[in-house]
Amino acid sequence: MAEAEEDCHSEAVREGDDDDENESPAETDLQAQLQRFRAQWMFELAPGGGSGNLESRPCRAARGSLLRAADTRGKQELAKEEKARELFLKAVEEEQNGALYEAIKFYRRAMQLVPDIEFKITYTRSPDGDGVGNSYIEDTDDDSKMADLLSYFQQQLTFQESVLKLCQPELESSQTHISALPMEVLMYVFRWVVSSDLDLRSLEQLSQVCRGFYICARDPEIWRLACLKVWGRSCIKLVPYTSWREMFLERPRVRFDGVYISKTTYIRQGEQSLDGFYRAWHQVEYYRYVRFFPDGHVMMLTTPEEPQSIVPRLRTRNTRTDAILLGHYRLSQDTDNQTKVFAVITKKKEEKALDHKYRYFRRAPVQEADQNFHVGLQLCSSGHQSFNKLIWIHHSCHITYKSTGETAVTAFEIDKMYTPLLFARVRSYTAFSERPL
C-alpha cells in the first residue's frame, strides 16, 4: 500500500514537471524539493514506513517499557493483596481456635503488606470468635436485612448441635465455664444483673456478649417482671405493644438509674447601707433533687449544695441528710395521653432526746400536727433521651392537726421559680445488686 502511494506521488511529481517545463530552473528545483518533502512525509505517516520511523522508535520503546513496568507493578500489588488476604484469613482461623499469639502474628504480617486488608475481604464464613457457632453465611446482605434477630439466633443455635448450648468457651480452661450452667441457673444470674433496681441497661450490654446471651436477655419473663414492678396491675395486657420489652422501652415511666435535678437562680435585694448611697444585690442559687425508686418510694431535697456533693448521698433511702423529704409516688395517664407523676412527701421524722432538766416542770401543751407536701409533675422527653424531663404542675402543703383532725391546705403558685427537672444518670446507683428481680 505504501509503495502504491509512493508511485502515485511519483507520477504526480512527473506530471507536475511536464507541466512546468517552461518555468525557470530555480522555481523547478524548489518545486521538486517540495514534492520530495510531501512524498517523504506521506511515507512516514504510513504504517511500517521503513527508515522514516527511526526517529519515533525511541518514543515507542519508552512507552512500551512504561506499560510493561505498570503491568508488572499491578501484578505485584495483586500478589501482595492475595498474600495479605491469606495471612488475614489464617489469623482469623487461629483466633477462633484459641491461638491468640499466633493470630496476632498473622494479623501483623497481613496489615504490613496491605493496611486496609480487613475491608477488602469478602467473608464466606462468619469471622467472629464468640464461640457461639461458625455458621456459614450465604449472603451478607440478606443477613443485614433480617429484622428478627432473636429467631435467627435461635435457628443458628439449633442447627449447631443437637444439645442446645447458649455459648462455648473461647479458651480451654480447667475451671467450669458458664456454658455448663443449666438454662434456669443462667436466667437467675440474669435476674441478678437486672436486680431490684431495674438496671435494664446492664442487661442490654450483657446481650452483646454472644448470641446465647442475646437470647437470654430477650426472655419475655424478665421484661414482664420489670413492667409489673413499674406499672403494677395496670400493665396486665400488652395492647397496644407487641412485647413486654417494647412496653418497657416506649411506655412513659420515671427513670431509676439516676436523679432528676433542677437549678433555680434569682436576684434578691439586700439591705441598704448606713450612708444610704449603696444597696447590695444578691444572686441566690439553689437546687432541687428528685430520686425515684422502683418500689414506689421517692426522695426530694432542696438545697444550695451542688450535685457533686449531694448526688452520692441519694443512692439509698437511708441517708443522713436532715432536709430530705421522703414519700410515695404513682404514675397517672389522663385522657390527654399526658403521663403525670403525683407524690406525697414528708420530712423525715427526728427522734428528740428526752430533756431531763425540765421533766418536773409543767409545760404549755403544744398542738401536734402532721405536715406533708403534695407534688404534681408532668413526664416529658427532650432531645435524644426518653422520659428525662419533669415539669411542675402542682405543689401544695397540707397540715393536719391531730387534736381536731382539721387539715389546712396551702397551694403554691407555679411560676418561673419552678424550673423543670432534668434527668442525670449516675453509674454508682447501679454498680452492684442487692436483690434479684
From Swiss-Prot:
Residue ranges of domain F-box in the record: 175-226
> Which positions does the record annotate as the modified residue Phosphoserine?
126
List the InterPro entries: F-box-like_dom_sf (IPR036047), F-box_dom (IPR001810), Hrt3/FBXO9_C (IPR045464), MIT_dom_sf (IPR036181)
Q: Which GO terms describe its cellular component?
A: cytoplasm; SCF ubiquitin ligase complex
A Pfam short name: FBO_C
**Annotated TPR repeat ranges:** 84-117
Q: What is this protein called?
A: F-box only protein 9
Organism listed in the record:
Bos taurus
Q: By which gene is this protein encoded?
A: FBXO9
